[in-house]
């Protein structure tokens, strides 16, 4: 089956069917193989792409820049000091940039900003991350799971997400799983469970796809027999440090350590993380957390993160291939 996603925005996975998501994954796999083989064909030659980053980034920025370069496109980086939303409305910015550029990436805060860009730019707009959604990450995640899934299809896999299940990763993983028929278990304290309206919407999607959503505060129930465990940061650099104590105390029982790995009863289980991860005291934040809370590592321990269970760096590499696929599918010649 062929898909035509040309000129489509990529703002959230709710906008796409399961088959369209699988098409993007397959395209990312093809582009990855072509890059390794030295046979990549440039589909974005002569295109100009704006990268708007109101939030800082390493992986997302590098992934977009390298993917665009590989495909023959030119990029302009627009940082947090731009006039968008300050001296010029998002709507006006969209209409201006849409005259200069063939595609626009946005990474920032409210989903309403990227939706406004998508409505008014007149060119494809891609969501590099908002407070509500992180859709490009999921294409990379599902691609990585297929690489490490021992031949299983996505609809045969079980994934446990540990921690804050109401953040952008919890939302995106739940929707992504519901779209492709995967079983996902969101494991965390009740105060961190996702919005009931979104859960209801995803349960309706599961009736079509055959997926399954389990939400629990019981770690043993959540991880038993899963193929993958997924973690995300507990503390954000954008929030006051006085909130850290509450979040860390609430989420401490959901740290991924070797006991959790053992509890899966699956020797082939793999650990995933969208990165950056706080797994030791080798960063300023990690050192501060160790001094203040007497913890080496937060969402994952060092022994798990540095073990053969971890596939985080394959996952990080696949950010570039999957972002390239999204740009080629929506903008490529």
UniProtKB/Swiss-Prot annotation:
User: Which pathway?
Assistant: Amino-acid biosynthesis; L-arginine biosynthesis; L-arginine from L-ornithine and carbamoyl phosphate: step 1/3
Protein's recorded name = Ornithine carbamoyltransferase
Q: Where does carbamoyl phosphate bind?
A: 57-60, 83, 107, 134-137, 274-275, 319
Q: Which PANTHER family match?
A: ORNITHINE CARBAMOYLTRANSFERASE, ORNITHINE CARBAMOYLTRANSFERASE, MITOCHONDRIAL
EC nos: 2.1.3.3
- Pfam families noted in UniProt: OTCace (PF00185), OTCace_N (PF02729)
Q: Name one GO cellular component term.
A: cytoplasm
InterPro entries per record: Asp/Orn_carbamoyltranf_P-bd, Asp/Orn_carbamoylTrfase, Asp/Orn_carbamoylTrfase_sf, Asp_carbamoyltransf_Asp/Orn-bd, Orn/put_carbamltrans, OTCase_ArgI
Q: Which gene encodes it?
A: argF
Q: Taxonomic classification, please?
A: Bacteria, Pseudomonadati, Pseudomonadota, Gammaproteobacteria, Vibrionales
Reactions accelerated catalytically: carbamoyl phosphate + L-ornithine = L-citrulline + phosphate + H(+)
Its biological purpose is as follows: Reversibly catalyzes the transfer of the carbamoyl group from carbamoyl phosphate (CP) to the N(epsilon) atom of ornithine (ORN) to produce L-citrulline.
Q: Which family does it belong to?
A: Belongs to the aspartate/ornithine carbamoyltransferase superfamily. OTCase family.
What is the top EC class of this enzyme, as a single word? transferase
Q: Where does L-ornithine bind?
A: 168, 232, 236-237
Query: Which keywords describe this protein according to UniProt?
Result: Amino-acid biosynthesis, Arginine biosynthesis, Cytoplasm, Transferase
Give the molecular function GO annotations: amino acid binding; ornithine carbamoyltransferase activity
Q: Among the record's GO biological process terms, what is one? A: arginine biosynthetic process via ornithine
Predominant location category: cytoplasm
Q: Where in the cell is it found?
A: Cytoplasm
């Amino acid at each position: 089956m062929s898909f035509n996603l040309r000129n489509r925005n990529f703002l959230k996975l709710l906008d796409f069917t399961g088959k369209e998501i699988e098409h993007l994954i397959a395209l990312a796999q093809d582009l990855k193989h072509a890059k390794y083989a030295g046979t990549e064909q440039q589909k974005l030659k002569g295109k100009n792409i704006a990268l708007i980053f109101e939030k800082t980034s390493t992986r997302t920025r590098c992934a977009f820049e390298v993917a665009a370069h590989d495909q023959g496109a030119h990029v302009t980086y627009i940082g947090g000091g731009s006039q968008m939303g300050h001296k010029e409305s998002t709507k006006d910015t969209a209409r201006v940039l849409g005259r200069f550029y063939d595609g626009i990436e946005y990474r920032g805060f409210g989903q309403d900003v990227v939706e406004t860009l998508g409505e008014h730019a007149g060119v494809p707009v891609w969501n590099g991350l908002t407070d509500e959604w992180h859709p490009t990450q999921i294409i990379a995640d599902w691609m990585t799971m297929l690489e490490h899934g021992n031949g299983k299809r996505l609809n045969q896999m079980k994934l446990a997400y540990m921690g804050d299940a109401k953040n952008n990763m919890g939302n995106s993983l739940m929707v992504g799983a519901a779209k492709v028929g995967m079983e996902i278990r969101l494991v965390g304290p009740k105060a961190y469970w996702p919005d009931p309206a979104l859960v209801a919407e995803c349960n309706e999607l599961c009736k079509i796809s055959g997926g399954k959503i389990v939400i629990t505060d019981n770690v043993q129930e959540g991880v038993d027999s899963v193929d993958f465990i997924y973690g995300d940061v507990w503390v954000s650099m954008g929030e006051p440090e006085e909130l850290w104590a509450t979040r860390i105390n609430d989420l401490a029982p959901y740290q991924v350590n070797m006991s959790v790995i053992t509890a899966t009863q699956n020797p082939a289980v793999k650990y995933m993380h969208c990165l950056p991860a706080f797994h030791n005291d080798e960063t300023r934040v990690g050192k501060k957390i160790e001094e203040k809370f007497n913890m080496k590592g937060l969402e994952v321990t060092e022994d798990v993160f540095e073990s053969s269970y971890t596939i985080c760096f394959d996952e990080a590499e696949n950010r570039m291939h999957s972002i390239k696929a999204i740009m080629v599918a929506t903008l490529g010649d």
